[in-house]
Amino acid sequence: MKIRNSLKSLRGRHRDNQIVRRKGRVYVINKTQKRYKARQG
């Protein structure tokens, strides 16, 4: 999982990427390509 300041550019890397909020943190998740996981930090 990558830790990035801005997730907007990471979301555009794959069409299945989703931005979700969990426990006050913002994540990019992808059900089909797991390597696109990222967290904002």
From Swiss-Prot:
One of its GO terms (molecular function) is structural constituent of ribosome. Signal peptide: none annotated. Keywords: Ribonucleoprotein, Ribosomal protein. Pfam families: Ribosomal_L36. GO terms for cellular component: ribonucleoprotein complex; ribosome. GO terms for biological process: translation. Disulfide bonds: none annotated. InterPro entries: Ribosomal_bL36, Ribosomal_bL36_sp, Ribosomal_L36_bact. It comes from the Bacteria. Belongs to the bacterial ribosomal protein bL36 family. PANTHER family: 50S RIBOSOMAL PROTEIN L36 2, LARGE RIBOSOMAL SUBUNIT PROTEIN BL36B. This is Large ribosomal subunit protein bL36. It comes from Methylobacterium nodulans (strain LMG 21967 / CNCM I-2342 / ORS 2060). The gene is rpmJ.
